[in-house]
Amino acid sequence: NYKGKESLSRVVMNQTFEDMKEIVRKNPFAQHIGMELLEVTEGYALGRIRLAKQYENIYGGMHGGCAYSLADTLSGIAASTYREYVTMLDASMNYLLPVEHTEYVYCKARVLRHGRKITVVRVELLNDEQTLLIDGSFTFYSIRKRDE
């Protein structure tokens, strides 16, 4: 049982940027990789992590799982901005360029389609120069509406 479950559920009920930042702050794995939430609007989330040695793969670039974790979290936040509890159904990522030689890795998550039950989110991971490194698509199922 997750210790912060009650407080996390309470935080998820609101949709302000500060509340979404609190969700990231209370997520132990997001904190472990130093994830920062920079912007949230309806259907959109922007965040970043600092590229660090402990996140590298054997070739010196960012490990794919670390990039996926950033995209997973940001796409979930973007999908949840419609006051719904969501769970991921499917995800696909295209690793276009190695993630290296950058201070930060940014993730932009934008809702492409928000339906009654299904939400599709496009993610883009970029370096400091805003070069597209990874893109992907995440599909979420809306479990139920949250109370206002």
Predicted segments — roles?
Residues 2-148:
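Terminal targeting signals and extreme-terminal segments of soluble enzymes
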